[in-house]
Regions:
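Conformationally flexible catalytic loops at phosphate/diphosphate-handling active centers
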Residues: 75-107
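Conserved catalytic cysteine-centered active-site region
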Residues: 42-47
């Protein structure tokens, strides 16, 4: 209900959901994307929201910037979905300089 309210109020909001491992009897054997349907359809009435999902650990930073850009530009909540593999993964990645970051100001 809160996300649907944010859609109707046109609040730019970034919701980050790190999905946990699947069902198991101890240590999960695989990750799940169980929150995808909830993110897509889990609101009352017609309140569609964009969903951004990174594919690599290094892509998470760019995906977060893109989700923030969409939220600010279109004044809507945006879901940023990730999973356990990405949350615990690592790879070489260069932190960009401040001047290299995109301008997120709304004009």
């Amino acid at each position: 209900e809160t996300i649907g309210l944010a859609v109707s109020l046109e609040l730019p909001l970034l919701v980050v959901a790190i999905q946990r491992g699947g069902p198991s009897t101890g240590l999960p054997t695989k990750t799940e994307q169980a929150d995808l349907l909830q993110a897509m359809f889990g609101r009352n009435g017609e309140a569609p929201v964009p969903i951004v999902a990174p594919c690599t650990p290094a892509d998470c930073f760019d995906a977060a910037l893109e989700a923030a850009r969409i939220a600010l530009t279109y004044r809507t909540p945006v879901f940023l979905l990730s999973d356990g593999y990405l949350a615990n993964g690592s790879e070489p990645w260069r932190i960009p300089e401040t001047e290299e970051l995109p301008d997120l100001r709304v004009r």
